[in-house]
UniProtKB/Swiss-Prot annotation:
HAMAP family in the cross-refs: RimP
Broad class of where this protein is predominantly found: cytoplasm
Subcellular location(s) of the protein: Cytoplasm
Any Gene Ontology biological process: ribosomal small subunit assembly
Protein name: Ribosome maturation factor RimP
Length: 151
């Protein structure tokens, strides 16, 4: 069975793309009685506050009709930002050579939190260099991954 995020992506992507944006990723965070639905959008030109407001109106209209979430939630639409979250193999592959931090579901080498450099992505496996060690992590073992912004 598809996850809620997958179903939401299938539902929202056509309208978001028709408006000129790309759905970078979707997070649904349950926080007691009130949850948060985060939709990250991107485009070649970057994303402005007006773009987020425009996409939010489009997304809200779809969610009001389809009603895929039964409990109360807040919709947040934003750009992925400098420390952008990574959601799939293509996104990790796009940032080969960049610093990344990942939170794992199951520990690798005794750790659930890794910081390192993305070495390569093959299929659904991420190779990351952490403190001189090369580690291979299954993408489905990554709970959360983010680029580490360089200033």
């Amino acid at each position: 069975m598809a996850t809620l995020e997958t179903r939401l992506a299938e539902m929202l992507t056509p309208a978001v793309e028709a408006a000129g944006y790309v759905v970078w990723g979707i997070e649904y965070v349950q926080a007691g009685k009130h949850s948060i639905l985060r939709v990250y959008i991107d485009s070649e030109q970057g994303i402005s506050v007006d773009d987020c407001a425009d996409a939010s109106r489009q997304i809200s209209a779809i969610l009001d009709v389809e009603d895929p979430i039964s409990n109360e939630y807040t919709l947040e639409v934003s750009s992925p930002g400098l420390d952008r979250p990574l959601f799939n193999a293509a996104q990790y592959a796009r940032y080969v050579g960049e610093d990344v931090k990942v939170q794992l579901t199951m520990p690798v080498e005794g750790s659930r939190n890794l910081k390192g450099v993305i070495d390569k992505v093959e299929g659904q496996m991420l190779t990351i260099k952490v403190d001189g060690k090369t580690l291979v992590v299954a993408l489905d073992n990554i709970r959360k991954g983010n680029i580490i912004a360089k200033f």
